[in-house]
Amino acid sequence: MDIKKVLLLGGSGFVGTYIANRLSQRGIEVTIPTRRRERTKALIIQPNVEMPEVNINSEEALVALMQGKDAVINLVGILHSRDVVLPYSKDFAEAHVELPKRIVAACKKAGVRRLLHMSALGASPQAPSEYLRSKGDGEAIVMAAQGELDVTVFRPSVIFGLGDSFLSMFASVLRKLPFFPLGFGHARFQPVWAADVADAYVDSLGNAATFGQAYDLVGPRIYTLRELVDYTAELVGSKARIIALSEGWAYLQAGLMWLSPKPLMSPDNLRSMEVDSVCDGKCNLPANWHPTALEAIAPTYIAHNTPKGKLDSFRFRAGR
């Protein structure tokens, strides 16, 4: 399958920027709809990237955007919602379930067979959190279209890299406060680098062997949340005291943070952590999957202004 033009939904976000760059580097024309074009200046100057101001909330708008495209990539997702509703809130339903429904229908109307979709490791209709339940239902909708469309789903663990809201958030707090209250420190993750995720998407685009597959995207090592916070503290040279919270106190803290205009954490995030975001030998990995170690990348953007970070960055660039 020869892919020359791609519609990238959610392309102005963290992972989308990496994928857009990879596509652009390969000479593929990329269309990234956005509501506020002025906020995406770094992408606008990329060659082969077009960013029309379009609201994608209607099937008709999606069909129009898909005209002349060879493939669609959907990365749209949210981490927080202001409502608590079973099985999930209106916000989660719209982003993770209703939008994939519209995308599938629009692909069929526009005659675009190739669809790649972002789910999440642990996504399932039976998962403990609204986020994972809605992601699971959205994934099922996309996978059910296989046959009429050529679909591939990706299910990453937590994604790290320059511009993330994961290690960078830890680093910001550790630099500012003398203590770090940490709940669910036992939760396990298998962090994967955003550039590796981008490569998985781009390498799969024209590969018929990936049609109908749901791939798990994980890094080479499993960490507890406490280990990741400790490592980030080491990178930034923080002496902050890390205080382990009981489950009750963790949910109280998350509830208070959830009330802020831009929450860093919510009770639903903690419920997601009840399921380890790891692959314990039951993975469906992409062919030739060789993920990059977190320790090779994190110092290049977390500790770049510390002596240790500068040395680690030099070693990484030098291939040492």
Regions found by a protein language model. Name each.
Residues 248-320:
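A hydrophobic C-terminal alpha-helical subdomain
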Residues 172-192, 196, 200-216:
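A conserved pocket-lining segment of Rossmann-fold NAD(P)-dependent short-chain dehydrogenase/reductase
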Residues 188-195, 217-235, 244-254, 290-293:
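Substrate-binding strand-loop-helix patch
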Residues 38-109, 121-125:
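NAD(P)H-binding glycine-rich loop region in Rossmannoid oxidoreductase-like domains
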Residues 3-26:
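N-terminal Rossmann NAD(P)H-binding glycine-rich loop of SDR-like oxidoreductase domains
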Residues 29, 78, 89-152, 157:
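Conserved Rossmann-fold NAD(P)-dependent oxidoreductase catalytic core, especially the SDR/UDP-sugar
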